């Protein structure tokens, strides 16, 4: 590979000009390592392409995570503590982490009392979805309704609705903090109708699913919304006292328990 070493500078310039930063980095490392003279041209090219592919994949994940706006940006599946005292099933949780529910456009519902780690767990699944190649968006439901109401006034409603319905995984955090108004019912139905069997939606709530009908208030609209949200959704129920009361306990550790039900 003596000829290759002689062409290092112009070759690097060309790679940088083409945006092949991964290949350029691999080239530099290979030329500095001993023993690389024994590699064939195909082996050099393969190593360089591997680096470029990895770099671009990492960049896409970073971009998806930046767009997701996760509340707990560092939450990840690997950090869940599956202590026996908790009861959160490792097998079922890791099965969900494989992402088949996302490709099948199914939902995920996480319920539990305040402070039990619902939002953190939702963000961990959001990060995992981004790793698997899915676009993700996290929103708090009360804030979403505020933004939708304002969007109707300033003309940006179609653009905001499109953003909420187009993303491959929409995380709706803190659903059920209040009874929905007529406008909020309409907005929620608009979102779930557009997403039904096309995209995946993850919802967290303090109140159990059995109480959601009353929160939506209008019986006909509630039936329509819940039929689209609940029937094809996996469920996780977190139990235990608020983790905010456990001074040194990390998220999803300590006394809470969890159950996962398949749809």
From Swiss-Prot:
InterPro entries attached to this UniProt entry: AAA+_ATPase, DNAC/IstB-like, IstB, IstB_ATP-bd, P-loop_NTPase
Keyword annotations of the record: ATP-binding, Nucleotide-binding, Plasmid, Transposable element
Positions that bind ATP: 112-119
Pfam families registered for this protein in UniProt: IstB_IS21 (PF01695)
CDD domains: AAA (cd00009)
GO molecular function: ATP binding; ATP hydrolysis activity
Statement: the UniProt record of this protein carries the keyword Cell wall biogenesis/degradation: no
Signal peptide: none
Transmembrane intervals: none
An annotated GO BP: DNA replication
Alphabetical list of PANTHER family matching this protein: ATP-BINDING PROTEIN RV3427C IN INSERTION SEQUENCE-RELATED (PTHR30050:SF4), CHROMOSOMAL REPLICATION INITIATOR PROTEIN DNAA (PTHR30050)
Protein family according to the UniProt entry: Belongs to the IS21/IS1162 putative ATP-binding protein family.
Protein's name in the database: Putative insertion sequence ATP-binding protein y4bM/y4kI/y4tA
Provenance organism: Sinorhizobium fredii (strain NBRC 101917 / NGR234)
Lineage of source species: Bacteria, Pseudomonadati, Pseudomonadota, Alphaproteobacteria, Hyphomicrobiales
């Amino acid at each position: 590979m003596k000829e290759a070493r002689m062409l290092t500078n112009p070759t690097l310039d060309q790679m940088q000009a083409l945006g092949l930063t991964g290949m350029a980095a691999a080239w530099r490392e290979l030329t500095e390592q001993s023993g690389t003279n024994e590699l064939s041209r195909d082996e050099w090219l393969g190593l360089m392409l591997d680096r470029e592919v990895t770099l671009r994949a990492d960049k896409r994940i970073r971009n998806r995570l930046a767009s997701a706006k996760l509340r707990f940006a560092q939450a990840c599946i690997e950090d869940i503590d599956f202590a026996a005292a908790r009861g959160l099933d490792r097998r079922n949780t890791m099965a969900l982490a494989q992402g088949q529910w996302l490709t099948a456009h199914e939902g995920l519902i996480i319920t539990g009392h305040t402070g039990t780690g619902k939002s953190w767990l939702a963000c961990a699944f959001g990060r995992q979805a981004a790793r698997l190649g899915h676009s993700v968006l996290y929103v708090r439901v009360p804030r979403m309704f505020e933004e939708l109401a304002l969007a109707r006034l300033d003309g940006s409603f179609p653009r905001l609705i499109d953003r909420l319905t187009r993303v491959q995984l929409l995380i709706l955090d803190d659903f059920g903090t209040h009874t929905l108004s007529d406008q909020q019912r309409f907005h929620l139905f608009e979102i779930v109708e557009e997403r039904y069997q096309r995209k995946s939606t993850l919802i967290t709530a303090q109140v159990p699913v059995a109480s959601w009908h009353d929160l939506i208030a209008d019986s006909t609209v509630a039936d329509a919304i819940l039929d689209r949200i609940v029937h094809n959704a996996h469920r996780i129920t977190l139990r235990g006292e608020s983790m905010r009361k456990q001074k040194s306990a990390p998220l999803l550790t300590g006394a809470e328990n969890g159950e996962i039900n398949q749809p």
